[in-house]
């Protein structure tokens, strides 16, 4: 099963355009600009076609895209995760451009069975503490401006510290003018728990009880697909609960990597590092693409497939498990608009739990697989598109798609 995480909004540096990242037409394929979601759907279509072709050529040594009854017309499961801000736009986009949420029928031209997994986890932004602001502005590395500009910046920072102290450090951030910006997604760790909380995983396992593996990836990892060779490698190392894909690190790769802590190899998030320049010691970057063995992961949550019918038990198990993972506090700017072109920008604090921290748990059996950059590199900013086009990454993505 192909699991695409699309919780992001206001990303790919849309300069405040409010675009859902998954729906951003970032590059031209087949003579037409395609969105991130279009690319991932077309990759699923190509994967199923290749499996069918191999199945026809070699009936004994191929990977079959079949159901329990042996039918060869059975689309690849493609689950798209959403948040409270992205669910409706993505649902409307699929209805307009991909004939809705395609089901498993003989006339399914997309060769994929697309489902939406609606996010059930949400957070409320808070007023940061003065200590948080001082750490962000005074203790972390910052560019020094010319004397006059630096005075203006220091004055503005001082005013924001006074605002945080007067409003109430650590209190809830509330803005009646734009209530949605008071809420925030709580990190991509919750994408898998959301599958259980909203019943998506339960329904999929009931429809296809032979399902054993999930492949989780970010929407901006455009080269990730269900590669039969990688899947075979994952199955061969059958003891792993999670298999993370990593890529050779380059200077622009920020956000964490593969490291060794207390003689244990694990993923280290950038937010967990004491200094920003510590990230430069990593040789491998975390692509966030993860192969998940379903039953073993459920066992780590103290659950089984049959337990997924009990919503209260699932919620309690997930809540207890989440307490074992670190929680990060990040500062995010929000705009308070007063009208007539006047607005103020305030820093707010939000908390996040990150999926890669699953590797920090001692009982979590994790393996790590080095893959080429064309498969694991992420597109975070439009400035990356030129290099992405020139180094052959775009050509590789086009070769694994069927538009």
Predicted features by range, described:
Residues 6, 84, 372:
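Residue-level signal for short, function-critical loop segments
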Residues 320, 324-403:
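Long, compositionally biased intrinsically disordered regions
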């Amino acid at each position: 099963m192909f699991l695409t995480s699309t919780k992001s909004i206001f990303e790919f540096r849309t300069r405040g355009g409010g675009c859902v990242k998954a729906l951003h037409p970032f590059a031209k394929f087949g003579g037409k600009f395609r969105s991130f979601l279009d690319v991932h759907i077309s990759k699923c279509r190509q994967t199923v076609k290749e499996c069918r072709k191999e199945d026809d050529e070699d009936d004994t040594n191929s990977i079959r895209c079949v159901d329990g009854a042996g039918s060869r017309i059975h689309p690849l499961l493609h689950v798209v995760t959403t948040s409270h801000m992205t669910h409706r736009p993505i649902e409307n986009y699929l209805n307009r451009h991909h004939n809705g949420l395609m089901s498993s029928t003989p006339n399914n031209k997309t060769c994929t069975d697309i489902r939406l997994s609606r996010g059930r986890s949400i957070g409320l932004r808070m007023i940061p503490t003065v200590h948080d602001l001082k750490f962000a502005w005074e203790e972390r590395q910052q560019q020094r401006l010319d004397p006059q500009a630096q005075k203006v910046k220091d004055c503005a920072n001082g005013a924001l510290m006074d605002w945080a102290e007067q409003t109430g450090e650590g209190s809830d951030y509330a803005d009646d003018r734009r209530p949605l910006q008071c809420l925030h997604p709580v990190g991509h760790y919750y994408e898998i728990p959301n599958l259980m909380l909203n019943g998506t995983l339960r329904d999929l396992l009931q429809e296809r009880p032979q399902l054993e593996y999930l492949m989780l990836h970010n929407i901006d990892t455009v080269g990730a697909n269900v590669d039969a060779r990688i899947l075979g490698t994952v199955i061969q190392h059958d003891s792993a609960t999670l298999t993370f894909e990593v890529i050779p690190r380059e200077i622009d790769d920020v956000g964490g990597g593969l490291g060794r802590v207390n003689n244990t190899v694990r993923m280290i998030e950038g937010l967990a590092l004491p200094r920003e320049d510590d990230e430069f010691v990593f040789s491998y970057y975390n692509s966030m693409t993860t192969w998940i063995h379903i039953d073993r992961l459920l066992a780590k949550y103290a659950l089984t497939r049959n337990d997924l019918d009990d919503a209260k038990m699932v919620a309690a198990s997930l809540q207890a498990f989440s307490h074992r993972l670190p929680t990060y506090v990040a500062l995010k700017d929000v705009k308070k608009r007063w009208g007539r072109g006047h607005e103020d920008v305030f820093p707010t604090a939000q908390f996040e739990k990150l999926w890669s921290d699953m590797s920090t748990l001692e009982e979590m059996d994790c393996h790590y697989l080095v893959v080429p950059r064309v498969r694991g590199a992420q597109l975070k900013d439009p400035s990356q598109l030129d290099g992405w086009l020139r180094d052959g990454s775009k050509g590789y993505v086009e070769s694994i798609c069927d538009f």
